[in-house]
């Protein structure tokens, strides 16, 4: 397995490569945690990965690894931004049982091709059974009456 932290921050001809991140929930543009992305570079507004989304019942979605397509956005982020998002998502490190979300390597599809990077998958069994592919669309169609909390773990 490639260590993306090392692979994407290794200088090449004076340039520092930064990790890429696929976001699918409250970190997307127009959502309540998009402020965490203010220093990120948007690579694509129309990206997708394999999986499906579930409603956690807490005002944010969770990603499950399944064979559907999930809509989202594709960003280049700094190590500092990635660390702040790790904290937001309650990601403590690989295999840590306290993780609310696990950060995993993923294959992202967008108009420019297929790329590798990071995303977060939900690490709990407590969610509503309905599966969907686009958080923004789902949230608009299924106003649940649950007020979205700010600065608590909200999935991508």
UniProtKB/Swiss-Prot annotation:
One of its GO terms (biological process) is antibiotic biosynthetic process. Keywords: Antibiotic biosynthesis, Lyase. The gene is btrG. GO terms for molecular function: amidine-lyase activity; gamma-glutamylaminecyclotransferase activity. Belongs to the gamma-glutamylcyclotransferase family. Its EC number is 4.3.2.6. Pathway: Antibiotic biosynthesis; butirosin biosynthesis. The active site is at residue 89. Cyclotransferase that catalyzes the last step in the biosynthesis of the aminoglycoside antibiotic butirosin B. Cleaves the amide bond via transamidation using the alpha-amine of the terminal gamma-L-glutamate of the side chain, releasing it as the cyclic 5-oxoproline. It comes from Niallia circulans. Pfam families: GGACT. It catalyses: gamma-L-glutamyl-butirosin B = butirosin B + 5-oxo-L-proline. GO terms for cellular component: cytosol. SUPFAM superfamilies: Gamma-glutamyl cyclotransferase-like (SSF110857). This is Gamma-L-glutamyl-butirosin B gamma-glutamyl cyclotransferase. InterPro entries: AIG2-like_dom (IPR009288), GGACT (IPR039126), GGCT-like (IPR013024), GGCT-like_sf (IPR036568). Substrate binds at residues 24-27.
């Amino acid at each position: 397995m490639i260590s993306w932290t090392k692979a994407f921050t290794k200088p090449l001809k004076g340039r520092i490569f930064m990790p890429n991140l696929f976001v699918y929930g409250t970190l997307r543009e127009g959502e309540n945690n998009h402020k965490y992305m203010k220093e990120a570079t948007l690579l694509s507004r129309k990206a997708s990965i394999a999986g499906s989304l579930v409603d956690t019942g807490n005002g944010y979605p969770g990603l499950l690894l399944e064979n559907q397509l999930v809509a989202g956005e594709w960003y280049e982020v700094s190590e500092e931004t990635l660390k702040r998002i790790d904290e937001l998502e309650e990601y403590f490190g690989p295999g840590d049982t306290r993780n609310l979300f696990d950060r995993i390597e993923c294959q992202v599809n967008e108009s420019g091709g297929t790329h590798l990077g990071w995303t977060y998958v939900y690490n709990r069994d407590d969610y509503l059974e309905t599966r969907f592919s686009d958080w923004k669309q789902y949230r608009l169609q299924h106003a649940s009456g649950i007020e979205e909390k700010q600065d608590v773990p909200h999935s991508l």
